[in-house]
């Protein structure tokens, strides 16, 4: 997919850059694989704001994407590639030999009519899913399970992938996009290929209204708030905040390591 630009007929089109979705399915989603989605709008079950700057947004139907890929040794044909408003990459509708359908994450270079399969010792082909122990070192993969049978958790957003950098006993060494190398059970499943829509990172929203369609509210700086609302608030006239940058709850915003899971530290190589 390519990017599309707009002539500056209005202020909102000046500088706007969006992804051209002409090649995607233009109809409705597959009815049995969607359900209504109740938007939380940044609130918890008490109605209190737990994630600031979120509200509204266009109503979305949730597409039930299969991250587990448990239908082994059964060929599936890609029927169509669709836009999914709930994630940044595209999804594909596949039809199995038993006439059942599933939604999968769509990798780059996959086309309508391509055949894919899940299972052990299958062909190294874009869209095929297999255990890590059957994938050669250096191959780009996505939708990687952390625990065998737990469903894909790693590399699920637009244009992302990870690579196998080596083996360590019963574990595969996976190099993440951040540069981190992590040990994952070699029986865990992964899918071959890089995920679709790599130009997602290059879009420019162009206007405030498009942010509201996405469910994003305006972001107010802490230094212009009152002391009751933010640690940087208050002061006579324009102030610098008086302390190192922090979040509204007082947590350091610059470089504080927030990971606190000693149980899984042993799986992080570097």
Provide a role label for each language-model segment:
Residues 96-99, 177-178:
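Short acidic-glycine loop/turn motifs at beta-strand connectors
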Residues 86, 94-96:
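Structural recognition of beta-strand segments within beta-rich domains
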Residues 1-87, 108-270:
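Basic, glycine/proline-rich low-complexity segments that contact nucleic acids
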Residues 99-111:
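Beta-strand/loop nucleic-acid-binding surfaces
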Residues 92-93, 172:
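Short, hydrophobic/aromatic-rich beta-strand segments within well-structured domains
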């Amino acid at each position: 997919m390519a990017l599309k630009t707009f002539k500056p007929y209005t202020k909102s089109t000046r500088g706007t850059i969006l992804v051209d979705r002409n090649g995607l399915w233009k109809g409705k989603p597959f009815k049995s694989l969607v359900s209504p989605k109740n938007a939380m709008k940044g609130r918890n079950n008490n109605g209190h704001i737990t994630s600031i700057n979120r509200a509204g947004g266009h109503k979305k139907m949730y597409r039930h994407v299969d991250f587990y890929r448990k239908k082994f040794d059964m060929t599936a044909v890609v029927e169509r590639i669709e836009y999914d408003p709930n994630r940044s990459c595209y999804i594909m509708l596949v039809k199995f030999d038993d006439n059942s359908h599933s939604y999968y994450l769509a990798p780059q270079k996959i086309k309508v009519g391509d055949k894919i399969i899940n299972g052990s010792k299958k062909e190294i082909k874009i869209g095929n899913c297999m255990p890590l122990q059957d994938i050669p070192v250096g191959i780009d993969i996505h939708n990687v399970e952390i625990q065998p049978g737990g469903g894909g958790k790693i590399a699920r957003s637009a244009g992302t992938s990870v690579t196998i950098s080596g083996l360590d006993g019963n574990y595969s060494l996976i190099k993440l996009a951040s540069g981190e190398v992590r040990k994952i059970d070699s029986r865990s499943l992964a899918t071959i290929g890089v995920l679709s829509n790599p130009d997602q990172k290059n879009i420019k929203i162009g206007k405030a209204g498009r942010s509201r369609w996405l469910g994003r509210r305006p972001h107010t700086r802490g230094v212009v708030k009152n002391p009751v609302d933010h640690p940087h608030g208050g002061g006579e006239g324009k102030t610098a905040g008086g302390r190192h940058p922090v979040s509204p709850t007082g947590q350091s915003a610059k470089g504080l390591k927030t990971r606190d899971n000693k149980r899984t530290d042993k799986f992080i190589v570097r």
